[in-house]
UniProtKB/Swiss-Prot annotation:
Listed Pfam families: Ribosomal_L21p
Span list, region Disordered: 111-132
InterPro entries recorded: bL21-like, bL21-like_sf, Ribosomal_bL21, Ribosomal_bL21_CS
GO MF annotation: an example: structural constituent of ribosome
One GO BP: translation
Protein name stated in the entry: Large ribosomal subunit protein bL21
Function of the molecule: This protein binds to 23S rRNA in the presence of protein L20.
Organism this protein belongs to: Dehalococcoides mccartyi (strain CBDB1)
Length: 132
């Protein structure tokens, strides 16, 4: 399989997305113009190819840079209201607005440089034979 799999799990709009550099991601509408850059700092998990870092709840210092590629509308979702025996019915439709992001870099920000915890020294009970 060869290549290094660098990816991150980010949060945007209350939803979580697994992103890799160069990927196009559709997130809920953001108030940004096409071509604007954004830094997503809610990184929940980070895999840099060697180590996996899991945040609690987020990883401090880790960021994902992205550029707005455009805005689109999703597929139309229909809701239908119907009342029996009264000829009362209503069909409603909704199209969700999305922002398309092009993922740039995944910056660790020193997230993988956490020092390992040292094991605790075990206490030993010494027994003396001199009666003290």
């Amino acid at each position: 399989m060869g290549g290094v799999n660098i990816y991150a799990i980010i949060e945007s709009g209350g939803k979580q997305y697994k992103v890799t550099p160069g990927q196009l991601v559709e997130v809920d509408l953001l108030d940004l113009a096409e071509g604007d850059s954004i830094e997503l700092d809610k990184v929940l998990m980070l895999n840099d190819g060697e180590t996996v870092t899991i945040g609690s709840p987020t990883i401090s210092g880790a960021k994902v840079t992205a550029t707005v590629a455009g805005h689109i509308k999703g597929d139309k979702v229909f809701a239908y209201r119907f009342k029996a025996k009264t000829r009362n019915h209503k069909k409603m439709g909704h199209r969700q607005l999305y922002t398309v992001l092009t993922i740039g870099e995944i910056l660790t920000g020193g997230a993988a440089e956490k020092p390992a915890r040292k094991p605790r020294a075990k206490k030993t009970n010494e027994v003396t034979t001199d009666g003290a």
